[in-house]
Amino acid sequence: MPKVTYDAIKGLVQKSGSGIELEGDIALTGGLTATGALSVTGSATLSAALIGSVDTRAEAGAVSLTKLTTLVTVTGGADRAITLAAGTAGQIKIIILTSKGGAGNAVLTPSVLEGGTTITFDAAGDAVVLVYTGAKWAVVSNIAAAIA
């Protein structure tokens, strides 16, 4: 498929390569769905909510790196060991313990954590917001979780 570019003066122009390239200001009415990565060079201004996808975890294991938020539930007396692999520099990850039934806690072990090695969630509502620095996960917000 040839590459199509839009130029404000020339209109649609066919070039070698593939994809679509748009230059100048673009007004979009309606929805836009991007499958795969969407890159924005420059500022992105949102006039409505930014809504990220959600991962739910009720068992031990790795939390999703491709979803913004992970909601964790714990039932029973045993701790839930959850892990978080290295991310991409600037990546944001939100983890919330939404429900707890029993004595067990959710214990998160990120690949590398600034200021500790684990984050323990022991009550519903405990939450952290993490940002990956390119070398480690940094806690930028913590609601009642224990970092050790």
PLM region spans:
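Exposed extracellular interaction/assembly regions and N-terminal maturation sites
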Residues: 41-109, 133-148
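Extracellular disulfide-bonded cysteine-rich modules/repeats
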Residues: 123-134
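Sterically constrained small-residue positions within well-ordered secondary structures
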Residues: 3, 86, 99, 120-121
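Intrinsic low-complexity, repeat-rich intrinsically disordered segments enriched
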Residues: 1-68, 107-109, 113-116
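Beta-strand-connecting loops/turns
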Residues: 17, 90-92, 125
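Viral virion structural and adsorption modules
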Residues: 2-5, 13, 121, 137, ...
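Short amphipathic beta-strand/extended segments with alternating polar/hydrophobic composition
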Residues: 21-25, 83, 122-123, 141-143
